[in-house]
Regions:
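Terminal, low-structured helical/coil segments at or just beyond the last alpha-helical repeat
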Residues: 6, 94-138
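Helix-start (N-cap) detector for alpha-helical repeat units in TPR-like alpha-solenoids
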Residues: 6-7, 40-41, 74-75, 107-109
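Register position in tetratricopeptide repeats
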Residues: 18-19, 52-53, 86-87, 116-123
Length: 138
């Protein structure tokens, strides 16, 4: 029964993610992972979902657990590199970039993705400062 249930949860998680219901997909991927903790595909998709909503620390944990099961997933290294960059773990990010590229990821594309994430982070910091300034003025 749990064999079929984990797959049902996983597939519902995928469909939820495709529909833009990322928080819902996280729930389903977590339920699926509890039933099938040794499945790297579940953990990878959990990482992608966390990354999508900006929960980079949780995403890193999921990608790391996925890579413990299957260390040949260049996408997991690439996504984890992006997450590490976002939380200013640049040494770890660079290490994962090198590993992803060694496994076939396109270096220019990955570096561009990291650059975009860093730009987004800077914009968020600026916006946060503006909001705080406005709150203090009111």
């Amino acid at each position: 029964m749990s064999q079929e249930l984990w797959k049902s949860y996983f597939n519902t998680g995928l469909e939820s993610a495709k529909a833009g219901m990322v928080e819902t997909s996280i729930d389903y991927f977590e339920w699926s992972a509890k039933l099938k903790p040794d499945n790297q595909e579940i953990l990878y998709n959990l990482g992608v979902s966390y990354m999508t909503i900006g929960k980079m620390t949780e995403a890193i944990k999921a990608f790391t657990n996925s890579l413990k099961i299957d260390d040949t997933n260049s996408d997991a290294y690439a996504n984890r590199a992006i997450c590490f960059s976002y939380i200013d773990e640049n040494g770890k990010s660079l290490s994962d970039v090198k590993q992803a590229v060694k496994m076939g990821a396109v270096e220019a594309g990955l570096k561009q993705a990291i650059k975009l994430v860093e730009e987004k982070k800077l914009k968020e910091k600026k916006l946060s400062k503006i909001k705080k300034k406005n709150e203090n003025n009111n």
